[in-house]
Amino acid sequence: RSLVGSEMCIRDRDDVQAYAAQDIKNAIAFVEEHTGQHWDWSHYFECAKRVNDTTRNRLAWLEMNSTPFPQFVGAPFSLYNDTNYMGNCGRSEKFPPIDRKIMRYAERGSRARRMMAKEYRHRAIVWGVQPQYCIDMLNWMVHCWGIVPLTDMLSLVNTRMIADTDTPENREQAFYDMAWLNENMIMRNRTHGGYKVLVDELWEFCETMHADMVIMWEHMSCKALTGMHGQFEEQARARGIHLVWVCHDLCDPRVYTRQAIRDQLNAYMRTVMREEPLDPSIEVLPDENAW
């Protein structure tokens, strides 16, 4: 099965794409009219080449993570993708050399079969709205419980190559490509688009990445996934996938302290999985400075 997920049905309709592309044209025309600046096609296609380079790297890292020895896991995968895909999106020339350096390290680790912990017990897909940047929970999961976070919902963005050569045909295609990238922006590509992209594709990624566990973040201030709670539970059970709900309120420790977030996983692993931590010394961590 390919790592490229099935695309959203409504976004494949020609009339939808034409409407979205026209919106991009209108936005560019508005900026040109009110600023006196003109769209630079040469610069656009330079950026498009870097966007494609980023997409190829992301697919290669996902392919690597589908093996028994994943190398690009946890928050580094998601935080780097967020920055590169959404914040940079091909504009900076500094990213491709960094990408190549990262790839060399990852390939070297894969050949050497390097592991982040002494034992990998479970392979997990991380789904939902995540707080891992502020508490580094994914790194903790690996070292405390041997749960390897292979990828996360916010990193599973565009997998298409866009037109990156300046031709009259590609200039027209570029409006559609920009529309597609906006349609498949981080968060929007999962929480907007219906049941298929939020629920069905999760199980496809579990199969592709050989995951036996899903860490389901439940952000208390965001109800995007709440309506699907029962569906997630029922379908995970039918597939034999362990689904762990972990509540949080992002960086706010007044609602859920960092240890309270970790304890939800601790309780699941001890009571449901009947497992002991790989490293009991980090099961409970001091969080006095969480504020």
Task: Please state what every model-predicted region is.
Residues 114-116, 155-163, 277-291:
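Domain-level signal for soluble alpha/beta catalytic cores
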Residues 14-15, 158-165, 254-257:
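Short, charged, surface-exposed secondary-structure boundary motifs
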Residues 1-10:
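Single conserved hydrophobic/aromatic residue that forms the stacking wall/gate
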Residues 21-160, 191:
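A charged, amphipathic alpha-helical module
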Residues 15-21:
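Long, hydrophobic, well-ordered secondary-structure blocks that form the structural core
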